[in-house]
UniProtKB/Swiss-Prot annotation:
Residues 1-18 form the signal peptide. Coiled coil: none annotated. Monomer. The gene is lolB. The lineage of its organism: Bacteria, Pseudomonadati, Pseudomonadota, Gammaproteobacteria, Cellvibrionales. It comes from Cellvibrio japonicus (strain Ueda107). This is Outer-membrane lipoprotein LolB. Plays a critical role in the incorporation of lipoproteins in the outer membrane after they are released by the LolA protein. A lipid is attached at residue 19 (S-diacylglycerol cysteine). Gene3D superfamilies: Lipoprotein localisation LolA/LolB/LppX (2.50.20.10).
Length: 203
């Protein structure tokens, strides 16, 4: 369970920094406008449940993710509040904290995944995907939209991401649709994130 919680935390933490142009398929103009509004939200928080499933093992954790422009904090806990983990991240440093264990440090969350869980995964796109955004620097190889013009399926970096349960939230005067459920699949690995609440523009 500890290895799974480490992986869940670090998958979430990976790649929260970075910005560049996209290649591959181009989203339609209405979707591009929506994405530009989302990218303008520099601070946000989500509360929910994150799960992972592979042929070898599976597990889940309660998640709180607080994002600021240049740093973030992620809290995860296993069933009944056991195995609490905290990730603290800045542009050039990531720290994993767990009660009773020495802190683990690295320059990136990808490095910590390898150190803590023994997995090597291309996960720098996840912080974009969670907001319903295609990740920068990575070609879009597949894109399907809902009747409302929002992403229902995205294919990028050999992952397939399914979106559902969109709900409206406000950032100032701007109304934004954000996903309530995300399923990401890569070969025989599946991540499921159920988001109970979004808070936009937190400080």
């Amino acid at each position: 369970m500890y290895r799974l919680l480490c992986l869940l935390a670090l998958l979430t933490a990976a790649g929260l920094m970075g910005c560049a142009s996209q290649r591959g398929l181009t989203p339609p103009p209405d979707l591009q406008a929506h994405q530009q509004q989302l990218q303008a939200v520099a601070s946000w928080q989500i509360d929910g449940k994150l799960g992972i499933r592979s042929p070898q093992e599976s597990g889940s954790a309660t998640l709180k993710w607080q994002q600021q422009p240049d740093n973030y904090q992620i809290y995860l806990s296993g069933p009944l509040g056991q195995k609490r983990l905290q990730i603290i991240g800045a542009p050039a440093a990531v720290t994993l904290l767990q009660s009773g264990q020495p802190p683990m440090h690295a320059q990136s969350a990808e490095s910590l995944i390898k150190k803590a869980a023994g997995w090597t995964l291309p996960v720098s796109q996840l912080s974009y995907w969670v907001r319903g955004l295609p990740a920068p620097k990575t070609p879009i190889t597949g894109l399907q939209l809902s009747p409302q013009g929002l992403i229902s399926e995205l294919q990028q970096a050999n992952w397939t991401i399914h979106y559902s349960n969109y709900r409206d939230y406000y950032h100032g005067e701007t109304r934004l649709a954000l996903p309530g459920k995300i399923q990401a699949e890569y070969r025989d690995l599946r991540l499921t994130l159920v988001i109970r609440d979004w808070q936009l523009g937190i400080h």
